[in-house]
């Protein structure tokens, strides 16, 4: 379950940012992240892990806003573009592998138009903390 490692990274990164900016007496109310579709992250598991890892910190109780970035592939040979959803039926058996190693999806894909294996992942592997919102703490 790599959702736990994502959640820990989110908490650690925001805590570092708070310290760096001298924001010691604040309560984080929202954390905004973008995560690629190819990571196959379960948003419920991610939120649960975030909730657990943020206990006792300024992030406790913060909303975790998750934007899932859709995948996009391009064939280097013919230029055709497509998404993960377009080829999901062919990849269904490999979902557990893709879940753990999203970068391997490139090795499992062929262009649906020309059948070339020269495929580039344009988007869908992101993990970005876009920002966070906070308010002054009364504590």
UniProtKB/Swiss-Prot annotation:
Pfam families, per database record: HypA
Any GO BP annotation: protein modification process
Keywords of the record: Metal-binding, Nickel, Zinc
Gene Ontology MF terms: nickel cation binding; zinc ion binding
InterPro entries found in the cross-reference section: Hydgase_Ni_incorp_HypA/HybF_CS (IPR020538), HypA/HybF (IPR000688)
Coiled coil: none
Gene3D superfamilies in the cross-refs: 3.30.2320.80
Binding site for Ni(2+): 2
Binding site for Zn(2+): 75, 78, 111, 114
PANTHER family named among the record's database cross-references: HYDROGENASE MATURATION FACTOR HYPA
Family: Belongs to the HypA/HybF family.
Role noted for this protein: Involved in the maturation of [NiFe] hydrogenases. Required for nickel insertion into the metal center of the hydrogenase.
Protein name listed in UniProt: Hydrogenase maturation factor HypA
């Amino acid at each position: 379950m790599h959702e736990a490692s994502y959640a820990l990274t989110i908490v650690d990164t925001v805590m570092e940012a708070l310290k760096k900016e001298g924001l010691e007496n604040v309560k984080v109310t929202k954390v905004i992240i973008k995560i690629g579709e190819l990571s196959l992250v379960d948003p419920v598991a991610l939120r649960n892990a975030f909730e657990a890892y943020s206990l006792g910190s300024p992030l406790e109780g913060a909303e975790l806003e998750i934007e899932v970035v859709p995948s996009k592939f391009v064939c280097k040979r013919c230029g055709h573009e497509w998404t993960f959803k377009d080829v999901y039926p062919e990849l269904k058996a490999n979902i557990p592998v893709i879940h753990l190693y999203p970068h391997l999806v490139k090795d499992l894909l062929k262009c649906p138009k020309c059948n070339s294996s020269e495929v580039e992942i344009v988007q869908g592997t992101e993990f970005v903390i876009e920002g966070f919102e906070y308010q002054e703490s009364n504590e």
